[in-house]
Amino acid sequence: MPDLKTVLVTGGAGYVGSVLVPKLLDKEYKVKVLDLYIYGEDVLAPVKENPNLKEVRGDIRDRSLLEGEIPGTDVIIHLACISNDPSYELDPRLGKSINYDAFIPLVEIAKRNGVKRFIYASTSSVYGVKQEDEVTEDMPLEPLTDYSKYKGKCEEVLLRQATEDFIATVIRPATVCGYSPRQRLDLTVNILTNHAINNGQITVFGGEQKRPNIHIQDITDLYVLLLEQPAHKIQRKIYNASYENHTIREIAEIVNRTLGDRIPIAIQPTNDMRSYHISAKRIRQELEFEPRHTIEEAILDLEGAFELGRIPNPMTDIRYYNIKVMQAIHMT
Protein backbone atom coordinates (compact mmCIF):
# COMPACT_ATOMS: atom_id res chain seq x y z
CA MET A 1 0.00 0.00 0.00
CA PRO A 2 1.30 3.49 -0.79
CA ASP A 3 2.29 5.52 2.27
CA LEU A 4 -0.32 8.23 1.82
CA LYS A 5 -1.91 9.66 4.94
CA THR A 6 -3.20 13.18 4.30
CA VAL A 7 -5.62 14.03 1.50
CA LEU A 8 -6.70 17.52 0.43
CA VAL A 9 -10.05 17.49 -1.37
CA THR A 10 -10.76 20.74 -3.18
CA GLY A 11 -14.50 21.11 -3.57
CA GLY A 12 -14.90 18.63 -0.73
CA ALA A 13 -18.26 20.11 0.28
CA GLY A 14 -19.67 19.73 -3.22
CA TYR A 15 -21.91 17.12 -4.82
CA VAL A 16 -19.17 14.49 -5.23
CA GLY A 17 -16.94 15.70 -2.41
CA SER A 18 -19.57 15.37 0.30
CA VAL A 19 -19.91 11.66 -0.54
CA LEU A 20 -16.16 11.12 -0.98
CA VAL A 21 -14.95 12.78 2.23
CA PRO A 22 -16.76 10.41 4.64
CA LYS A 23 -15.37 7.43 2.69
CA LEU A 24 -11.83 8.75 3.06
CA LEU A 25 -12.37 9.28 6.79
CA ASP A 26 -13.71 5.72 7.08
CA LYS A 27 -10.41 4.58 5.56
CA GLU A 28 -8.62 6.59 8.30
CA TYR A 29 -7.07 9.18 6.04
CA LYS A 30 -6.54 12.64 7.44
CA VAL A 31 -8.75 14.81 5.23
CA LYS A 32 -8.58 18.51 4.56
CA VAL A 33 -11.49 20.09 2.69
CA LEU A 34 -11.00 23.35 0.80
CA ASP A 35 -14.31 24.78 -0.36
CA LEU A 36 -16.25 28.03 -0.60
CA TYR A 37 -19.33 26.33 0.91
CA ILE A 38 -21.62 28.36 -1.33
CA TYR A 39 -24.13 25.50 -1.56
CA GLY A 40 -24.50 25.04 2.19
CA GLU A 41 -22.32 24.80 5.27
CA ASP A 42 -23.80 21.67 6.81
CA VAL A 43 -23.25 19.05 4.11
CA LEU A 44 -20.41 17.47 6.10
CA ALA A 45 -22.28 17.71 9.42
CA PRO A 46 -22.27 13.91 10.04
CA VAL A 47 -18.45 13.87 10.05
CA LYS A 48 -17.75 17.37 11.37
CA GLU A 49 -16.55 16.12 14.74
CA ASN A 50 -14.13 13.61 13.25
CA PRO A 51 -10.66 14.57 14.52
CA ASN A 52 -9.15 13.61 11.16
CA LEU A 53 -11.21 16.23 9.29
CA LYS A 54 -10.15 19.83 8.80
CA GLU A 55 -12.49 22.16 6.91
CA VAL A 56 -11.05 25.26 5.28
CA ARG A 57 -13.42 27.82 3.85
CA GLY A 58 -11.56 29.51 1.04
CA ASP A 59 -11.02 30.14 -2.65
CA ILE A 60 -8.63 28.04 -4.74
CA ARG A 61 -7.59 31.26 -6.48
CA ASP A 62 -6.05 32.47 -3.20
CA ARG A 63 -2.38 31.53 -3.60
CA SER A 64 -1.42 32.51 -0.07
CA LEU A 65 -4.12 30.17 1.23
CA LEU A 66 -2.77 27.34 -0.91
CA GLU A 67 0.78 28.04 0.30
CA GLY A 68 -0.48 27.75 3.86
CA GLU A 69 -2.68 24.66 3.53
CA ILE A 70 -0.87 22.40 1.05
CA PRO A 71 2.36 21.70 2.99
CA GLY A 72 2.05 18.33 4.73
CA THR A 73 -0.42 17.02 2.13
CA ASP A 74 0.27 13.66 0.46
CA VAL A 75 -2.54 13.67 -2.10
CA ILE A 76 -4.72 16.29 -3.75
CA ILE A 77 -8.04 15.25 -5.25
CA HIS A 78 -9.07 18.29 -7.25
CA LEU A 79 -12.83 18.49 -7.65
CA ALA A 80 -13.39 22.24 -7.24
CA CYS A 81 -14.55 24.10 -10.34
CA ILE A 82 -17.41 25.90 -11.99
CA SER A 83 -18.91 22.57 -12.79
CA ASN A 84 -21.06 22.65 -15.88
CA ASP A 85 -21.44 24.48 -19.18
CA PRO A 86 -24.38 26.75 -18.24
CA SER A 87 -22.71 27.91 -15.01
CA TYR A 88 -19.44 28.52 -16.85
CA GLU A 89 -21.11 30.49 -19.64
CA LEU A 90 -22.85 32.70 -17.09
CA ASP A 91 -19.49 34.42 -16.58
CA PRO A 92 -16.73 32.97 -18.79
CA ARG A 93 -14.07 35.20 -17.23
CA LEU A 94 -14.95 33.88 -13.77
CA GLY A 95 -15.10 30.32 -15.08
CA LYS A 96 -11.64 30.52 -16.62
CA SER A 97 -10.19 32.16 -13.50
CA ILE A 98 -11.33 29.23 -11.34
CA ASN A 99 -11.16 26.28 -13.70
CA TYR A 100 -7.90 27.08 -15.49
CA ASP A 101 -6.01 30.12 -14.22
CA ALA A 102 -6.11 28.87 -10.61
CA PHE A 103 -5.17 25.34 -11.64
CA ILE A 104 -1.67 26.24 -12.82
CA PRO A 105 -0.43 27.61 -9.48
CA LEU A 106 -2.30 24.87 -7.60
CA VAL A 107 -0.27 22.21 -9.42
CA GLU A 108 2.98 24.16 -9.04
CA ILE A 109 2.47 24.73 -5.30
CA ALA A 110 1.50 21.09 -4.80
CA LYS A 111 4.61 19.82 -6.55
CA ARG A 112 6.94 22.26 -4.80
CA ASN A 113 5.57 21.26 -1.39
CA GLY A 114 6.07 17.54 -1.81
CA VAL A 115 2.56 16.39 -2.68
CA LYS A 116 3.05 12.83 -3.89
CA ARG A 117 -0.12 12.32 -5.92
CA PHE A 118 -2.49 14.66 -7.77
CA ILE A 119 -5.82 13.32 -9.03
CA TYR A 120 -7.74 15.62 -11.35
CA ALA A 121 -11.46 15.37 -12.07
CA SER A 122 -11.76 16.42 -15.71
CA THR A 123 -14.89 15.67 -17.76
CA SER A 124 -15.94 13.25 -20.47
CA SER A 125 -17.36 16.18 -22.43
CA VAL A 126 -13.81 17.03 -23.58
CA TYR A 127 -14.46 14.66 -26.50
CA GLY A 128 -17.23 16.77 -28.02
CA VAL A 129 -19.51 14.99 -30.50
CA LYS A 130 -18.12 11.64 -31.64
CA GLN A 131 -19.61 9.20 -34.12
CA GLU A 132 -17.60 6.24 -32.85
CA ASP A 133 -19.48 3.63 -30.84
CA GLU A 134 -16.79 3.59 -28.16
CA VAL A 135 -14.87 6.77 -27.36
CA THR A 136 -11.52 5.88 -25.81
CA GLU A 137 -8.99 7.97 -23.93
CA ASP A 138 -6.64 8.11 -26.93
CA MET A 139 -9.09 9.86 -29.23
CA PRO A 140 -8.56 13.55 -30.03
CA LEU A 141 -10.33 16.11 -27.88
CA GLU A 142 -12.88 18.25 -29.71
CA PRO A 143 -14.54 20.26 -26.96
CA LEU A 144 -17.62 22.22 -27.96
CA THR A 145 -17.51 24.70 -25.07
CA ASP A 146 -14.97 26.73 -23.13
CA TYR A 147 -15.82 24.72 -20.02
CA SER A 148 -14.69 21.53 -21.75
CA LYS A 149 -11.78 23.22 -23.54
CA TYR A 150 -10.19 24.42 -20.31
CA LYS A 151 -10.78 21.09 -18.63
CA GLY A 152 -8.68 19.57 -21.41
CA LYS A 153 -6.01 22.25 -21.03
CA CYS A 154 -5.79 21.50 -17.31
CA GLU A 155 -5.08 17.87 -18.14
CA GLU A 156 -2.10 18.99 -20.24
CA VAL A 157 -0.81 21.26 -17.45
CA LEU A 158 -0.95 18.45 -14.90
CA LEU A 159 0.56 15.70 -17.02
CA ARG A 160 3.48 17.96 -18.05
CA GLN A 161 4.37 18.36 -14.37
CA ALA A 162 4.39 14.63 -13.60
CA THR A 163 7.65 13.19 -12.30
CA GLU A 164 8.72 10.08 -10.41
CA ASP A 165 7.89 11.91 -7.18
CA PHE A 166 4.73 13.67 -8.39
CA ILE A 167 2.17 11.17 -9.66
CA ALA A 168 -0.47 12.71 -11.93
CA THR A 169 -3.74 11.01 -12.83
CA VAL A 170 -6.70 12.33 -14.82
CA ILE A 171 -10.25 11.02 -14.52
CA ARG A 172 -12.82 11.89 -17.18
CA PRO A 173 -16.08 11.14 -15.40
CA ALA A 174 -19.39 10.59 -17.09
CA THR A 175 -22.34 12.59 -15.78
CA VAL A 176 -22.76 11.67 -12.13
CA CYS A 177 -26.14 10.65 -10.74
CA GLY A 178 -27.69 9.74 -7.42
CA TYR A 179 -28.19 11.13 -3.93
CA SER A 180 -25.65 13.31 -2.10
CA PRO A 181 -25.83 15.41 1.07
CA ARG A 182 -25.05 18.35 -1.28
CA GLN A 183 -27.69 17.39 -3.77
CA ARG A 184 -27.65 18.55 -7.38
CA LEU A 185 -30.85 18.46 -9.40
CA ASP A 186 -29.31 19.88 -12.58
CA LEU A 187 -27.74 16.63 -13.85
CA THR A 188 -29.53 14.44 -16.39
CA VAL A 189 -30.75 11.48 -14.31
CA ASN A 190 -31.39 13.69 -11.28
CA ILE A 191 -33.32 16.28 -13.32
CA LEU A 192 -35.59 13.70 -14.90
CA THR A 193 -36.19 11.89 -11.61
CA ASN A 194 -37.00 15.11 -9.78
CA HIS A 195 -39.50 16.22 -12.40
CA ALA A 196 -41.08 12.79 -12.62
CA ILE A 197 -41.67 12.62 -8.86
CA ASN A 198 -42.31 16.25 -8.00
CA ASN A 199 -43.76 17.65 -11.21
CA GLY A 200 -45.59 14.61 -12.51
CA GLN A 201 -44.02 14.87 -15.96
CA ILE A 202 -40.72 14.24 -17.70
CA THR A 203 -39.64 16.72 -20.37
CA VAL A 204 -36.83 15.62 -22.66
CA PHE A 205 -34.95 18.21 -24.71
CA GLY A 206 -33.85 16.57 -27.94
CA GLY A 207 -33.60 13.01 -26.77
CA GLU A 208 -31.17 11.34 -29.14
CA GLN A 209 -28.02 12.80 -27.58
CA LYS A 210 -26.01 10.16 -25.77
CA ARG A 211 -25.13 10.83 -22.16
CA PRO A 212 -22.84 8.45 -20.28
CA ASN A 213 -23.59 8.17 -16.58
CA ILE A 214 -21.95 6.93 -13.40
CA HIS A 215 -23.46 6.54 -9.95
CA ILE A 216 -22.06 8.84 -7.28
CA GLN A 217 -21.13 5.86 -5.10
CA ASP A 218 -19.04 4.42 -7.92
CA ILE A 219 -17.15 7.59 -8.82
CA THR A 220 -16.28 8.19 -5.17
CA ASP A 221 -15.20 4.56 -4.76
CA LEU A 222 -12.91 5.12 -7.74
CA TYR A 223 -11.17 8.09 -6.10
CA VAL A 224 -10.55 5.97 -3.00
CA LEU A 225 -9.23 3.14 -5.20
CA LEU A 226 -6.74 5.51 -6.86
CA LEU A 227 -5.16 6.22 -3.48
CA GLU A 228 -4.55 2.51 -3.01
CA GLN A 229 -2.89 1.89 -6.39
CA PRO A 230 0.89 1.59 -6.80
CA ALA A 231 2.26 4.81 -8.25
CA HIS A 232 3.56 3.21 -11.46
CA LYS A 233 0.09 1.92 -12.38
CA ILE A 234 -1.54 5.35 -12.50
CA GLN A 235 1.32 7.67 -13.41
CA ARG A 236 0.38 10.00 -16.30
CA LYS A 237 -2.74 7.92 -16.87
CA ILE A 238 -6.06 9.21 -18.19
CA TYR A 239 -9.16 7.16 -17.45
CA ASN A 240 -12.74 7.43 -18.58
CA ALA A 241 -15.09 6.67 -15.70
CA SER A 242 -18.49 5.51 -16.87
CA TYR A 243 -20.96 2.71 -16.45
CA GLU A 244 -24.03 3.14 -18.62
CA ASN A 245 -24.29 4.95 -21.95
CA HIS A 246 -27.84 5.88 -22.94
CA THR A 247 -29.60 8.51 -24.98
CA ILE A 248 -31.50 11.09 -22.97
CA ARG A 249 -34.75 9.62 -24.24
CA GLU A 250 -33.68 6.18 -22.97
CA ILE A 251 -32.82 7.66 -19.58
CA ALA A 252 -36.29 9.21 -19.41
CA GLU A 253 -37.80 5.81 -20.19
CA ILE A 254 -35.68 4.19 -17.46
CA VAL A 255 -36.88 6.81 -14.96
CA ASN A 256 -40.49 6.18 -15.94
CA ARG A 257 -40.13 2.41 -15.78
CA THR A 258 -38.35 2.51 -12.42
CA LEU A 259 -41.06 4.69 -10.91
CA GLY A 260 -43.88 2.46 -12.11
CA ASP A 261 -44.66 3.45 -15.72
CA ARG A 262 -46.94 6.29 -14.71
CA ILE A 263 -45.12 9.43 -15.87
CA PRO A 264 -45.90 11.12 -19.22
CA ILE A 265 -42.82 11.97 -21.31
CA ALA A 266 -42.82 15.14 -23.44
CA ILE A 267 -40.19 15.75 -26.14
CA GLN A 268 -39.01 19.31 -26.83
CA PRO A 269 -36.48 20.55 -29.42
CA THR A 270 -33.00 21.63 -28.30
CA ASN A 271 -29.85 23.13 -29.74
CA ASP A 272 -27.67 21.36 -27.16
CA MET A 273 -26.05 18.73 -29.36
CA ARG A 274 -23.39 17.48 -26.92
CA SER A 275 -23.33 13.73 -27.43
CA TYR A 276 -20.74 11.14 -26.54
CA HIS A 277 -20.53 7.43 -25.76
CA ILE A 278 -17.43 6.70 -23.75
CA SER A 279 -15.57 3.45 -23.21
CA ALA A 280 -14.45 2.45 -19.72
CA LYS A 281 -12.47 -0.53 -20.98
CA ARG A 282 -9.05 0.85 -19.97
CA ILE A 283 -9.91 1.41 -16.31
CA ARG A 284 -11.56 -2.01 -16.13
CA GLN A 285 -8.52 -3.76 -17.59
CA GLU A 286 -5.78 -1.82 -15.81
CA LEU A 287 -7.31 -1.16 -12.38
CA GLU A 288 -10.04 -3.82 -12.33
CA PHE A 289 -12.54 -1.08 -11.58
CA GLU A 290 -16.10 -2.23 -12.17
CA PRO A 291 -18.96 0.13 -11.33
CA ARG A 292 -21.60 -1.65 -9.25
CA HIS A 293 -24.48 0.82 -9.10
CA THR A 294 -27.07 1.35 -11.83
CA ILE A 295 -29.14 4.29 -13.01
CA GLU A 296 -32.16 2.53 -11.52
CA GLU A 297 -30.45 2.55 -8.11
CA ALA A 298 -29.76 6.27 -8.45
CA ILE A 299 -33.43 6.89 -9.25
CA LEU A 300 -34.60 4.84 -6.27
CA ASP A 301 -32.06 6.53 -3.97
CA LEU A 302 -33.44 9.91 -5.00
CA GLU A 303 -37.03 8.72 -4.59
CA GLY A 304 -36.22 7.58 -1.06
CA ALA A 305 -34.49 10.87 -0.24
CA PHE A 306 -37.52 12.84 -1.45
CA GLU A 307 -39.84 10.67 0.65
CA LEU A 308 -37.68 11.12 3.77
CA GLY A 309 -37.53 14.90 3.34
CA ARG A 310 -33.78 14.95 2.74
CA ILE A 311 -34.24 17.15 -0.34
CA PRO A 312 -36.80 19.75 0.79
CA ASN A 313 -38.40 22.10 -1.75
CA PRO A 314 -36.74 20.40 -4.73
CA MET A 315 -38.49 22.47 -7.38
CA THR A 316 -37.83 25.87 -5.80
CA ASP A 317 -34.74 25.78 -3.57
CA ILE A 318 -31.87 27.24 -5.60
CA ARG A 319 -29.16 25.34 -3.72
CA TYR A 320 -29.81 22.27 -5.89
CA TYR A 321 -29.12 24.19 -9.10
CA ASN A 322 -25.59 25.45 -9.65
CA ILE A 323 -26.46 28.17 -12.14
CA LYS A 324 -29.17 29.62 -9.89
CA VAL A 325 -26.76 29.84 -6.97
CA MET A 326 -24.15 31.48 -9.17
CA GLN A 327 -26.71 34.04 -10.31
CA ALA A 328 -27.86 34.72 -6.75
CA ILE A 329 -24.48 35.27 -5.11
CA HIS A 330 -22.93 37.33 -7.92
CA MET A 331 -19.63 35.52 -7.47
CA THR A 332 -16.57 37.36 -8.79
Regions found by a protein language model. Name each.
Residues 1-75:
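N-terminal Rossmann/SDR dinucleotide-binding element
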Residues 104-146:
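Conserved Rossmann-fold NAD(P)-dependent oxidoreductase catalytic core, especially the SDR/UDP-sugar
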Residues 61, 94-105, 141, 145, ...:
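Glycine-rich NAD(P)-binding loop of the Rossmann-fold in SDR/ketoreductase-type enzymes
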Residues 10, 34, 76-79, 118-123, ...:
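SDR active-site strand-loop-helix element
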Residues 156-211, 216-227, 255-257:
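NAD(P)-dependent short-chain dehydrogenase/reductase
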Residues 200, 205-208, 212-332:
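C-terminal substrate-binding subdomain of Rossmann-fold SDR/epimerase-dehydratase oxidoreductases
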Residues 60-98:
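NAD(P)H-binding glycine-rich loop region in Rossmannoid oxidoreductase-like domains
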Residues 43-44, 86-93, 129-133, 181-182:
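Conserved catalytic-core motifs of eukaryotic protein kinase domains, centered on the activation segment
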